[in-house]
Amino acid sequence: MDCLKDDRFKGMKHFWSSVVVDRPKNRKKLDENIQAYQQEAEFSIDEKIANLSDLTGIFPLDLVINDVLHQRFCDRAIPPLGDEDKRFSYPANSGDGYIAWCIPREIIKKKTRNKKDFWIVRVTDETCVDSKIKCWGVDSIKDNLYLNRPYIVKVNFSDQWGFSTKRGTTHWKLMG
């Protein structure tokens, strides 16, 4: 869309609001829209990710993970969570579980029947496979995950429950 924007617009969000959100029917209305939406800031990185994902159906991995970070994952043999062939080839050092990397896209907060908090985190990775990880034992005050940021996560897997982690977000490490 950058090729459509000219010097009358401050940024892409200004252009989008003037042309798409409030569609002008004539040139006079376009000029009014340009003045009305003059204060629009640029799209944030999260807005760009959401727009590209919604429009194309593919997560824009290049906006989240740079080549250096991706190479670090490869050098350490940390597979993406959606890669079934490599996922269980790299066990975690202590206890049960496996290490993989992923990008949280959505956090659904729920309660068990005993009124304990848990999260269902929808994640994606370079394989474009959406997975859900259940995070048990979440402290809603202390635990926090950032959406659209790469994490290394220690996960357990069972056929009945799928992916899960214990003790809130202690098994999640922010990488970017």
What do the PLM-derived regions correspond to, one by one?
Residues 1-90, 134, 161-176:
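Sliding clamp-binding short linear motifs
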Residues 56, 102, 148, 155:
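A residue-level signal for conserved active-site and pocket-lining positions in enzyme catalytic cores
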Residues 106, 155-161:
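Short, charged beta-turn/beta-strand-edge "cap" motif at the junction between a beta-strand
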Residues 95-114:
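Structural detector for short beta-strands of small beta-barrel domains
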Residues 109-136:
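OB-fold (S1/OB) nucleic-acid-binding surfaces
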Residues 98-100, 119, 151:
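Hydrophobic core residues within well-ordered beta-strands of beta-rich domains
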Residues 138-154:
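Short nucleic-acid-contacting surface segments enriched for D/E, G, S/T with interspersed K/R
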